[in-house]
From Swiss-Prot:
Organism of provenance: Chelativorans sp. (strain BNC1)
Name used for this protein in its record: UPF0262 protein Meso_0189
Pfam families, alphabetized: UPF0262 (PF06793)
Similarity remark: Belongs to the UPF0262 family.
Xref: HAMAP family: UPF0262 (MF_00678)
Source organism phylogeny: Bacteria, Pseudomonadati, Pseudomonadota, Alphaproteobacteria, Hyphomicrobiales
Length: 161
């Protein structure tokens, strides 16, 4: 990110569209943790924005597309990017299946079985995070940890639909 200060190339607030509905408590907990972690530590800069942040981000679904609406700290609009959800569908579906297996395994499986399922879960999460980084390339600069937390929020939106 070069000369941009990390204090300016970051998110200070993340909001998920509440009109999509609520997810089960464990999914809502994941949402809250992802947002907390994201605001605490992130790298986020809309490409071409010379003024810099910090930024606020609203994530929503519009016409079955992912909408990332970026504003400045004071609320002035910066940019809205619309992304197709198609590249994420298989990953999210597989991720949910593995998560379901993971939560079932916690109750009855051996530690090595739980660890194997968790490795698969993390692998899918990493794949989704990389896909998001690829889709944001040329639009918004993010680091991998920021992409991971944003992917978690995309999964929450999918769950709510």
């Amino acid at each position: 990110m070069g000369e941009r200060s990390s204090a300016k190339a970051r998110l200070i607030d993340v909001e998920l569209d509440e009109t999509v509905g609520r997810a089960p408590p464990d999914v809502e907990h994941e949402r809250a943790v992802a947002i907390f972690d994201l605001v605490e530590e992130n790298t986020f800069h809309p490409v071409g924005d010379q003024a810099g942040g910090p930024y606020r981000l609203k994530i929503s679904l519009i016409d079955s597309r992912l909408a990332l609406s970026v504003t400045r700290e004071g609320g002035d609009p910066v940019v809205t990017h619309m992304l197709s959800l198609t590249p994420f569908r298989r990953i999210v579906k597989d991720y949910f299946l593995v998560c379901e297996s993971y939560y079932q395994a916690i109750r009855s499986a051996t530690p090595s079985q739980i660890e194997a399922i968790d490795m698969g879960r993390r692998g899918l999460h990493n794949e989704g995070s990389q896909t998001l980084m690829d889709r944001l390339n040329g639009k918004i600069e993010v680091d991998f940890n920021t992409a991971r937390r944003l992917f978690t929020l995309i999964c929450v939106l999918h769950w709510r639909r």
